A protein has these predicted regions:
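N-terminal accessory nucleic-acid engagement/regulatory domains that precede
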Residues: 1-24
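Conserved ASCE/P-loop NTPase catalytic core
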Residues: 20-216
Length: 216
């Protein structure tokens, strides 16, 4: 996903809930592999979709354009619903460090166990940075490439075994790919990975949600 000059407008009135079969999801996944991204890949894809602005002077760090605030959303704080209202500058270097961390986490499972802490004096844009990252992730979720799917179990035929529940939705947004036979999902991911960059590739090791594992 690359939208260097775009502004994403979030309109909750246009949101829709849809249910599709696993086969339909697989068709969408092959069209938009980003539907299968893990949390790190989703955030990294969202923050980089607007691209970067190369510095005019070689000793200055590049600037990620999501810092310009390219999201129009009714959920933004303090009434700043329009784009370009939370323009951040002067923090390009720490943001580059965060982006390098996310890139590493996309390709290295061990790096996902790390965490970063924003340390700085009052009014140094720590909260605004996290808010911008959150708004940008919200905007990514409104795109076809950023839709987020989870799994719903139909328990009608065995509801007596689940205290009368007729359906259960995964609380952890389980990746539907984890419900494919392991040999099939490895074959599918290998095929998809051939067309992706290294930060977008999928790990063929699937770890299922414990809650959903009990319902399989």
């Amino acid at each position: 996903v690359f939208r260097p000059d775009d502004v994403i407008r979030i309109d909750p009135d246009k949101f829709e809930k849809k249910e599709i079969t696993l086969n339909e999801y697989l068709e969408l996944f092959q069209q938009y592999p980003s539907l299968g991204f893990d949390a790190y890949q989703r955030l990294y894809a969202a923050l980089r979709m607007f691209g970067t602005e190369e510095p005019k002077k070689p000793w200055k760090p590049k600037r990620w354009k999501f810092l310009d605030d390219r999201i129009e959303s009714p959920w933004k704080r303090a009434g700043a619903t329009s784009p370009f209202e939370i323009y951040l500058y002067g923090i390009e270097e720490p943001v580059n460090e965060i982006m390098r961390y996310l890139e590493d986490a996309c390709i290295n499972r061990d790096a996902q166990s790390r965490f970063f802490i924003l340390i700085g004096p009052p009014s140094s844009a720590k909260t605004d940075l996290i808010n911008l990252m959150s708004y940008t992730l919200d905007g990514f979720g409104t795109l076809p490439e950023g839709e987020l799917y989870t799994v719903k179990f139909n328990l009608k035929e065995n509801s007596d075994l689940f205290y009368g529940l007729e359906e259960v939705i995964c609380p952890a947004h389980e990746n539907p790919l984890n419900f494919l036979p392991r040999d099939k999902v490895r074959e599918l991911l290998k095929k998809v990975n051939e067309e992706l960059s290294f930060t977008d590739e999928f790990d063929t090791v699937c770890i299922g949600c414990p809650h959903c594992s009990l319902n399989e």
